[in-house]
Amino acid sequence: MIWRKEYLKKNYIKLLVPICVVLVLAYLNYAINYAVGYKLVYVHHSHAVAIILWVLLGFFQLELLVYWVLIFLVGPGKSPVFPPIDLYSENNKGLIPLPDLFFCDEKGFPYYCSNSNSIKLERSFFSKDVGYNVIKFDHYCIWIGQPIGQDNYLFFMKFMMGFLAFFIIVLIYCARFTRESIQQGEIDHNFIVLFVMSGFWIIMIGCLFGIHLRYVSINMTTLDEITINQRKRYNRWKDARKNPNMPSWMKTKNPPRKETGRKYVNVKHKTGRAIVRYYIDERPFDMGFRRNWINLVFNGNRNHGKDDEFYTLWRLAAAFVVFIIPFIDIPFSFRGKLQVKDDVEQELHEQENLLAKYTVYSSVVNDKFMNMIDEKLKKNSYSAPGYLVETTPQNNQSTIDKDSI
């Protein structure tokens, strides 16, 4: 975990940033609540207006604290440790029966994490900060001090909303009472700091919040976006190398990270298996705007496990209400976690319990993606699994060692 002594010795810088955030927040409280709220507004203007300021800032800071604690308490979402997949259909009870579809490398091997000795779920990522594979890993938030994943993503969004509201209130009060401060003789220097800090953080948090609203709407992660951008940079670099007339100052001296954006799925085809290629920007997990938002709020941020009747317009409207209003989302989030636990325990009594557990924790792909796979299979636009001719059953997984952060 992030509070392990040996981890803190090597990563104390990551702990210093949240501490600095708390210290800056403490100063901002002094500046806005005392220097502005009390000395200027309460004493020289209106008791009621000052009390409203204190109540609003107190409420949104309580929201910050609650969601900050919940982000740590709930965690980003831990992937179970899965044994290898039974690629050769040996009916080994210790292996996961072959799924109809799983994400793989170019040869058809499922991704295997050597750090956790487990098969990797799609979009999971091993984080050294917590010591396990995070389901639907998004990013490590240096300001909060915790990885953001499937389980604490909604709390992260609410945390940003609270911080944004805090700075908007600060900016409004500063703009309203700056003239009164000048009329007192000389502007309080705390106003300058408050203007700079609130303006800067409103822009920063507002842009970040807008980006993540887009991610929710299309069911993407920050890691997906990074991969797409790396692919664009790599393609620009390749095009620049092919163009001899391009000025030297426009050419990148150091080659970027090689990222083609090509991904692969291993699918059941007739009596065998097929490896189908796709690209990262095809968004296989995007279930549509309505379903994505309902899943975030009412389905534990999973993209499956509910019937079509669950995704009504009324429930979409309710999801927006729960998303906007602080604190009322908390019971729904914990209910979503309990639902995952119930689904696993219910399925584990069946014969293929490992496959059932693997399916519950995995994400499903959308119909558009499945249609794309079917079209490629019909056109014979696929390849045979490399492990059927190149490997032995003792070496049947693709090992990933470089995915740790």
Swiss-Prot record:
Keywords: Acyltransferase, Lipoprotein, Membrane, Palmitate, Transferase, Transmembrane, Transmembrane helix. It holds the Pfam family DHHC. Autopalmitoylated. It is found in: Membrane. GO terms for cellular component: endoplasmic reticulum; Golgi apparatus; membrane. Its main location: membrane. Its EC number is 2.3.1.225. It comes from the Eukaryota. The chain crosses the membrane at residues 12-32, 51-71, 154-174, 191-211, 310-330. It is an enzyme of class 2 (transferase). PROSITE patterns: DHHC. The keyword GTP-binding does not apply. Residues 111-161 form the DHHC domain. It catalyses: L-cysteinyl-[protein] + hexadecanoyl-CoA = S-hexadecanoyl-L-cysteinyl-[protein] + CoA. One of its GO terms (molecular function) is protein-cysteine S-palmitoyltransferase activity. One of its GO terms (biological process) is protein targeting to membrane. The keyword rRNA-binding does not apply. It is a multi-pass membrane protein. The DHHC domain is required for palmitoyltransferase activity. Belongs to the DHHC palmitoyltransferase family. PFA5 subfamily. This is Palmitoyltransferase PFA5. It comes from Candida albicans (strain SC5314 / ATCC MYA-2876) (Yeast). The gene is PFA5.
